[in-house]
C-alpha cells in the first residue's frame, strides 16, 4: 500500500466531520488544503435525481461563469467562406471543413470545444463516434451549432461551461482555479448550480438536487449545504 504524505494526510484530516457546510466555508477549507505544485481547479460534483437513460430525464446545458474558468480553451470551428473568416477573427484556434474532419479522423484532437455552422452538420455528423464520447459534438441546445460564430467562439473563450449528466445521475465541472479569490469561486459555484437547477427536465421525479460536493483537482471532497449552493 502506497504511503500517504504528511501534507496529504493533514489535508484529509482537516475535512473530517466537515460535511454540509456553506460554500464559503468549503472553498476556504479546500484552498487551505490545496497542496499540488500546480494551480488546481475547483471541481463541482452534483448528484441529481434523474435517470439519463430516459430521454425526458436528460440534463444538459451551458452557463457563463461570472468570473471565468481560468482555463485556456482551445476552440475548433467547422465553417466555410465568410463564416470561417468570422471564426478566425473571433479567435478560434482551428478552422476548417473537410480538412478539419480528416485531422480529427486521424486521431489529432487538439481542442476543447467544437462549434459548427448548421450547413456543416452533415459533415460533422460523420465524426459522431469520435466527438460524442468526448462531449465535443456540436449541439444547437448548447449554442455550438450556430450561424453566430463570433459570439459562440467568444463565449467558449470567455468562461462558458457546458454540462451534461452522466449515467449515474452525476454532473461535474471545473468552475475556476484555486488561485482565484474565495468570493469569486463561491460566485462561480452558485452560478453553475443555478444553471443545472434551471435545466431540470420535465421527466424528473422526486428530489432533483440531491447532493453538491466541492473539491480541488488533487484533494478530498466536501459536501455543501444545498441552500448555500444556490443563489437566494
Curated annotation (Swiss-Prot):
Kindly state which keywords UniProt assigns to this record, in alphabetical order. Repressor, Ribonucleoprotein, Ribosomal protein, RNA-binding, rRNA-binding, Translation regulation, tRNA-binding
Classification via PROSITE patterns: RIBOSOMAL_L1
Short name of one Pfam family for this protein?
A: Ribosomal_L1
**Per its UniProt record, what Gene3D superfamilies does this chain match?**
3.30.190.20, 3.40.50.790
Gene Ontology terms: cellular component? cytosolic large ribosomal subunit
Any one biological process term the GO annotation gives: translation
For this protein, what is any one GO molecular function term?
Answer: tRNA binding
Q: Which domain of life is it from?
A: Bacteria
According to its UniProt entry, what is the function of this protein?
Binds directly to 23S rRNA. The L1 stalk is quite mobile in the ribosome, and is involved in E site tRNA release. Protein L1 is also a translational repressor protein, it controls the translation of the L11 operon by binding to its mRNA.
Listed PANTHER family: 54S RIBOSOMAL PROTEIN L1, MITOCHONDRIAL, LARGE RIBOSOMAL SUBUNIT PROTEIN UL1M
| HAMAP family reported in the protein's UniProt record | Ribosomal_uL1_B
Record's protein name: Large ribosomal subunit protein uL1
Species name = Cereibacter sphaeroides (strain ATCC 17023 / DSM 158 / JCM 6121 / CCUG 31486 / LMG 2827 / NBRC 12203 / NCIMB 8253 / ATH 2.4.1.) (Rhodobacter sphaeroides)
Amino acid at each position: 500500500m502506497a504511503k500517504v504524505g504528511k501534507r496529504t494526510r493533514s489535508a484529509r484530516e482537516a475535512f473530517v466531520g466537515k460535511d454540509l457546510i456553506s460554500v464559503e466555508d468549503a472553498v476556504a477549507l479546500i484552498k487551505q488544503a490545496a497542496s499540488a505544485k500546480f494551480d488546481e481547479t475547483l471541481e463541482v460534483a452534483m448528484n441529481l435525481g434523474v435517470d439519463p437513460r430516459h430521454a425526458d430525464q436528460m440534463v444538459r446545458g451551458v452557463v457563463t461563469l461570472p468570473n471565468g474558468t481560468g482555463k485556456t480553451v482551445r476552440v475548433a470551428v467547422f465553417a466555410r467562406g465568410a463564416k470561417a473568416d468570422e471564426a478566425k477573427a473571433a479567435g478560434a484556434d482551428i478552422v476548417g471543413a473537410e480538412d478539419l474532419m480528416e485531422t480529427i479522423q486521424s486521431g489529432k484532437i487538439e481542442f476543447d470545444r467544437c462549434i459548427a455552422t448548421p450547413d456543416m452538420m452533415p459533415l460533422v455528423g460523420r465524426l459522431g463516434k469520435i466527438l460524442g464520447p468526448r462531449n465535443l459534438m456540436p449541439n444547437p441546445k448548447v449554442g455550438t451549432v450556430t450561424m453566430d460564430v463570433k459570439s459562440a467562439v467568444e463565449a467558449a473563450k470567455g468562461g462558458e461551461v457546458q454540462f451534461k449528466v452522466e449515467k449515474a445521475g452525476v454532473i461535474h465541472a471545473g468552475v475556476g482555479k484555486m488561485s482565484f479569490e474565495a468570493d469569486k469561486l463561491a460566485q462561480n459555484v452558485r452560478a453553475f448550480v443555478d444553471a443545472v437547477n434551471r435545466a431540470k427536465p420535465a421527466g424528473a421525479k422526486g428530489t432533483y438536487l440531491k447532493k453538491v460536493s466541492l473539491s480541488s483537482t488533487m484533494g478530498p471532497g466536501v459536501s455543501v449545504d444545498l441552500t448555500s449552493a444556490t443563489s437566494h
